[in-house]
């Protein structure tokens, strides 16, 4: 269990690992223009290779066609992105849906778009498809001196990020203290 998480979110890690990904854009017509160089089927295989039945998969928005996610047996959480039109279309495919950013721990904010914060918290997000900005990205850790982690699929080579490993390897070690904010009331399901 990831004890760093606020109590309501600890259940995500009770039986397995917590994985995150963003911007899968399954079946989106503009997918090739965003630097995607693998098929949806190949991308799904990479997700399923790590994320299993007892795990939790947190998708940080811009899902595309959610039917692709039926093949993933994990508990699924969505933080909606700018291409995700309504929560209603995703309810059959996700166990929890958040319409905006959510603090899952004192120093960890999940969002679709990056939220500039200085060093108050660590922002895990997607949205930015420019991989050249994120050369120091590491699957099991974090980039030294960075307070954000961009998990847009094409930026992270279509791999899911293991949150527990990231925390263990110092994900939030260079973040100053933060007071609990109340924007995590965006839950819709």
PLM region spans:
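N-terminal active-site segment of His-dependent metallophosphoesterases
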Residues: 1-68, 154, 163-168, 189
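Conserved beta-sheet core of the metallophosphoesterase superfamily
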Residues: 77, 84, 88-189
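Hydrophobic alpha-helical membrane-insertion segments
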Residues: 31-32, 71, 90, 136
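Short coil/turn segments at beta-strand junctions that form active-site/ligand-binding loops
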Residues: 15-16, 53-56, 74-75, 106, ...
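Short helix-loop-helix/strand-helix junction enriched in hydrophobic and basic residues
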Residues: 61-62, 78-82
